[in-house]
Amino acid sequence: MTQMAAARNGTVTEEMERVAEREGVDPAFVRQQVADGQAVIPANVGHDSLDPMIIGREFATKVNANIGNSEETSDIEGELEKLHTAVHYGADTVMDLSTGRNLDEIRSANVTHSPVPVGTVPIYEAVKRASDPSEITHELLLDVIEKQAKQGVDYMTIHAGVRMEHLPLTDGRKTGIVSRGGSILAKWIEENGMENPLYTKFEAICEIFREYDVTFSLGDGLRPGCLADAGDDAQFAELDTLGELTRTAWKHDVQVMVEGPGHVPMDQVAEQVERQQEVCDGAPFYVLGPLVTDVAPGYDHITSAIGATEAGRAGAAMLCYVTPKEHLGLPEKSDVRDGLAAYRIAAHAADVANGREGARDWDDALSEARYAFDWREQFDLALDPDRAREYHDQTLPGDNYKEARFCSMCGVEFCSMRIDQDARSDGDMESIEADADDRTPLEDSSAAAVNRPPVGTHDGADIPGPDADMPADTEGSADD
């Protein structure tokens, strides 16, 4: 029985109980949100290492990290190291977007070791097995999807909304079709002269998903790839189809979230979130950024985190991170770290802006430690403690500076907080308590787990590092 079926039957599952604990809400509320399709708990029945989490606009904003290999870099150990990094730095879910060798082995290793939900895009494996997009058959697609479901994948991006009738709508674009899945299916449609097989076989996919409790992540294959293409007829025609498919999946008791753009001018972000919520009857919105400018390759974790903050404030339930390597190359471990930092900031800022219960407690606790010159507490409370400590110690490395009432930015003479404290102690201004006993007690905070330190809610100790004994890369595997 799927989480949605159980919820509709009035049953609070173990997964719902765990989610309620992590979010600080009543399990009955979780059940109702899942029953109504307003939230999803991606939890394949075969993912034994999973710690359940929830995605929905009434819950803390979540962050996904994309990992995966390519033909140029196909290394199982490296992918597990990326998984370890993603989990350590706060990814709520990960997507394995591998397109190189050893797809089965990498996917299986990720599911085996990941405490967070694992997503995939099955059309990638279908292309690898067929050698060319036009050679993909309906049977091959269903076979790949069922195999990945059996492996324990929690959610899959299914680009079923790319219809034959939509393709002419992309003709006037500046950047055409920028989704890998969308472009693959567009080529299939053009060369075979038939409707998208993921659309025509959608109900069969629903049956597979219902058996293994896989969540749909309905892909936006026609998402805009630049500001000029945002909000065009192609994007919104596909969105209308995604609304139709959402309701079809719900009839099968299958959970659904809907993917969104992309590249969107800042002033259109909230409008696009609101339109998705209306068209898709409140199904959780999962957005890639969006990037709010196209001029900063190398810094697109920043251009997109700006849009992601606005999307989260407007109601997007999960933000798909973008790394500094976006548009330039395959991310490495350090890029995963930087992308997650940008997106954890975006998600937290959105939760604070939306008045999510307890979300600002973390900010208050760090501010109190800062005013008290409690450097060690500041580092411990930081979103990335290692980075905060590293930057401080570059100029003031000695332990004695951990007790100092200044840092190297202002020095002793010009530290504003030191001057303020001295003025309050010597004059008529009321003093501000800076003792540890008077600070915000985070252990009593009502905030969801993702809005309290440490950022990585799982330590990742069970995820093998690069030196672990893993299967060797194999030339000529079935996935080549």
Swiss-Prot record:
Cofactor note: Binds 1 [4Fe-4S] cluster per subunit. The cluster is coordinated with 3 cysteines and an exchangeable S-adenosyl-L-methionine.
Pathway: Cofactor biosynthesis; thiamine diphosphate biosynthesis
S-adenosyl-L-methionine as UniProt keyword: yes
Molecular function in Gene Ontology: 4 iron, 4 sulfur cluster binding; carbon-carbon lyase activity; zinc ion binding
Chain sites annotated for binding [4Fe-4S] cluster: C407, C410, C415
Residues that bind substrate: N66, M95, Y124, H159, S179, R180, G181, D220, G221, L222, R223, E259, Y286
EC assignment: 4.1.99.17
Gene3D superfamilies hit by this protein: 6.10.250.620, Radical SAM ThiC family, central domain
InterPro entries in UniProt: ThiC, ThiC/Bza_core_dom, ThiC/BzaA/B
Pfam families recorded: ThiC_Rad_SAM
Positions contributing to Zn(2+) binding: H263, H327
Biased composition (Acidic residues): 470-480
Keywords tagged on the record: 4Fe-4S, Iron, Iron-sulfur, Lyase, Metal-binding, S-adenosyl-L-methionine, Thiamine biosynthesis, Zinc
Catalytic activity: 5-amino-1-(5-phospho-beta-D-ribosyl)imidazole + S-adenosyl-L-methionine = 4-amino-2-methyl-5-(phosphooxymethyl)pyrimidine + CO + 5'-deoxyadenosine + formate + L-methionine + 3 H(+)
Cofactor: [4Fe-4S] cluster
GO BP annotations, alphabetical order: thiamine biosynthetic process; thiamine diphosphate biosynthetic process
Spans annotated as Disordered: 426-480
Enzyme class, spelled out: lyase
Summary of the function given for this chain in its UniProt record: Catalyzes the synthesis of the hydroxymethylpyrimidine phosphate (HMP-P) moiety of thiamine from aminoimidazole ribotide (AIR) in a radical S-adenosyl-L-methionine (SAM)-dependent reaction.
Sequence similarity: Belongs to the ThiC family.
Name assigned to this protein: Phosphomethylpyrimidine synthase
Record organism: Haloarcula marismortui (strain ATCC 43049 / DSM 3752 / JCM 8966 / VKM B-1809) (Halobacterium marismortui)
